[in-house]
Amino acid sequence: MSIRPWRHIERRKSRKIMVGNVAVGGDAPISVQTMTNTPTVDAQATIAQIKRCEAVGVDLIRVSCPDKESTAALKDIVRAAEVPIIADIHFHYKRALEAADAGAACLRINPGNIGSSERVAEVVRAAKANGCAIRIGVNAGSLEKELLEKYGEPCPDALVESALNHIKLLQDQDFHEFKVAVKASDVFLAVASYKALAKAVDCPLHLGITEAGGLIGGTVKSALGIGNLLWDGIGDTLRVSLSADPEQEVRVGYDILKTLDLRTRGVRVVSCPSCARQGFDVVKTVKALEERLAHIATPISLSILGCVVNGPGEARETDIGVTGGGQGKHMVFLSGVTDHTVEDAKMLDHIVSLVEAKAAEIEAEKAKEKAATVAAE
């Protein structure tokens, strides 16, 4: 038993599918997605944006395919990307057929506008022929007309019924490489819909609060909605939808997972809001560190506390810690133990060098363990 059972999250049991070379569901890590917002026909701009997202750790990227020109550009985009590409399809089912042929790893279809069961069957045939997965993307803003008439408004029962109807369409075609989302911009509606769907099916679930808003408001809304579900063990992949750069969606997605100890990437900073007791400018220091340590992918914890009230206690729980002291000298903790002091003028560069050295040490140890495992085989 864990020594901290109150921190344990038991994930919902789900089937594992493959989206390109990324496993989704089962015991696979919860993957982080985003979506490009460049014109897809501008392949170079789209590829450049994908590269920026890859640099911050994105696992899967969705690309909108509204017309033939976009699916024509998709082939070059898929070839240039290092992560699997998901084609976002609405209204025109033939775009899904073209995207599958262009190398998309997954086809996102919307039950509210993809069309008849015959069209869905054609999409399934294309997916099978090209080794694509499918995401059934139900959205409260584009529910089928008959479901709106039946229920009077978007509600959990309506979203779940839409999802179940389209799951059956895929299963009737003997297709099982699919994941499902039941998104809404209303957190209550989205959470209730996902919880109901999670009880009804065993397929992987793609989490998201759609049209969440700008960077701050959308982050809060997504953290509440997605975080609530993850805390309940629900969710196999996620996308934080923000009116912001896609790279920010990836960062927020990882921060939600980090907060719940479900997946860690990069430096997790514990810092105080600062007050008159601070021995150095905490806000300025943390901002600078977040920028200078953004390239670190290795999971490391770092505490930056302005004074000795909580500083030593937080430092005991992190890999590296700094606590503000008097006369411009600050305590540095390594692995929870007081190690040395550092002066104001040298502190920022010193912390960066400590984190980089710790990351290199961890990666070297990982490589050593991997080599030993390979040798043993």
From Swiss-Prot:
Biochemical pathway: Isoprenoid biosynthesis; isopentenyl diphosphate biosynthesis via DXP pathway; isopentenyl diphosphate from 1-deoxy-D-xylulose 5-phosphate: step 5/6
SUPFAM superfamilies in the record: Inosine monophosphate dehydrogenase (IMPDH) (SSF51412), Nitrite and sulphite reductase 4Fe-4S domain-like (SSF56014)
Free-text comment on the cofactor: Binds 1 [4Fe-4S] cluster.
Positions that bind [4Fe-4S] cluster: 272, 275, 307, 314
Main enzyme class: oxidoreductase
Coiled-coil spans in chain: none
Pfam families the record matches: GcpE
Cofactor: [4Fe-4S] cluster
Alphabetized UniProt keyword annotations: 4Fe-4S, Iron, Iron-sulfur, Isoprene biosynthesis, Metal-binding, Oxidoreductase
GO molecular function, one term: 4-hydroxy-3-methylbut-2-en-1-yl diphosphate synthase activity (ferredoxin)
EC numbers for this chain: 1.17.7.3
A Gene Ontology BP annotation from the UniProt entry: terpenoid biosynthetic process
Catalysed reaction, written as an equation: (2E)-4-hydroxy-3-methylbut-2-enyl diphosphate + oxidized [flavodoxin] + H2O + 2 H(+) = 2-C-methyl-D-erythritol 2,4-cyclic diphosphate + reduced [flavodoxin]
Cited HAMAP family: IspG
Described purpose of this protein according to its UniProt entry: Converts 2C-methyl-D-erythritol 2,4-cyclodiphosphate (ME-2,4cPP) into 1-hydroxy-2-methyl-2-(E)-butenyl 4-diphosphate.
NCBIfam families per the UniProt record, alphabetical: ispG_gcpE, PRK00366.1
Similarity comment: family membership: Belongs to the IspG family.
The protein's name in its UniProt record: 4-hydroxy-3-methylbut-2-en-1-yl diphosphate synthase (flavodoxin)
Species whose genome carries this gene: Zymomonas mobilis subsp. mobilis (strain ATCC 31821 / ZM4 / CP4)
Top-level taxonomy: Bacteria, Pseudomonadati, Pseudomonadota, Alphaproteobacteria, Sphingomonadales
